[in-house]
Amino acid sequence: VQTLAQLKAGELRGITHLKISEQLTEFPMEILDLAETLEVLDLSGNQLNAFPAEFAQLTKLKIVFASNNPFTTLPEVLGRCPNLEMIGFKSCAIKEVPANSLPPKLRWLILTDNNIEQLPDTLGQCVHLKKLALAGNQLTSLPQSMLHCHELELVRISANQLTECPDQLLNLPKLAWFAFSGNPFSQHNLELDTVPCVDFSQLELHHVLGQGASGVISKATWTHNEHQLPDEVAVKVFKGEVTSDGYPNDELQACLKAGSHPNLVKSLAQVQQPDNLALIMDLIPSHYQNLGLPPTLVTCTRDTFPADFSLEQTQIDKIVQQMRDVFTHLHQNKVCHGDLYAHNTLFDRDANILVGDFGAASMYHMLSESQQQQIRQIEQRALEHFIDDLASICVQTPDKIVA
């Protein structure tokens, strides 16, 4: 993180990345002095509500982040930035996305947790768009023009006001990761009691095991174990607010609807109290580790792996077969995982896997038969990408080439 003082003193000339978070109320015009080199600008966590027209002078700019600022309109000037590929305005107060605010090279648009009611038809002209995050807005429909967004691979439209399933997305040729829970069109009245409800006071939380967008997972023991569950368990306590993937309760319900499978983290019980929403799960053995790393700003939608990481073909074959089984099981239960990735998969040295993180999961039993088939086809692409990604880290022997 750099400082405003450094910027004003001219100490930052020649830099490619700039991040300033100092409760700024006005865009520092000195940033324009960096136009010849600046590629990444992060002004998240300030008090900005506008960018000046001169912002378009930042012709080398590829990425702009301005989350947690009180913008009510996505700045139109962004549309005049010739090389801008990535825009992140999460948790602002945006109501309006002007027709000319979307730049020609846009690949990645994050507008999660705003107040957007409508998107412009010009979104359909964003032919390079690969990743679109719109969860937690007030959208009642999506532009029909989006059927032209043929490069779209990842879409988040959960926690909106969409009254109809957006068919213009279901036929997109590359869409692979799709989250749509928490909308009127995906509403359901299932109250899943496949696992018992327990009182939060029956649990004693210990150290944190991990955390994600939707909650914190801790190791726990029982103060009162009325259902004879394992003595030691993992408890995911959900945060109250909307996440980049949707509402926490939709994640909980999807987990329960997914049911039991040897390669899914087992759900044991649930807490459904006004101030506590939690899922009690089997503790994952400590010898399991992450199979992959999340996508980067460069790979956009595709997973990455540590530089020295590789797998034998026999290990990959075993992992792939288990993931195929998980896929079949989930879709028999009409659950779309929405985030089928190596980085959401744990594995051990014997190539046994456990799939978790249902934050982007959506139930789809309420959709038409043809829509259900399309949802399955979308996730089938994610499965194929998962297999391709593993093939990229295969140790190949000279006489055996992976097809």
Per-region residue spans from a language model:
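Short beta-strand micro-motifs within the conserved protein kinase catalytic domain, predominantly
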Residues: 266-277
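Conserved protein kinase catalytic/activation segment
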Residues: 344-356
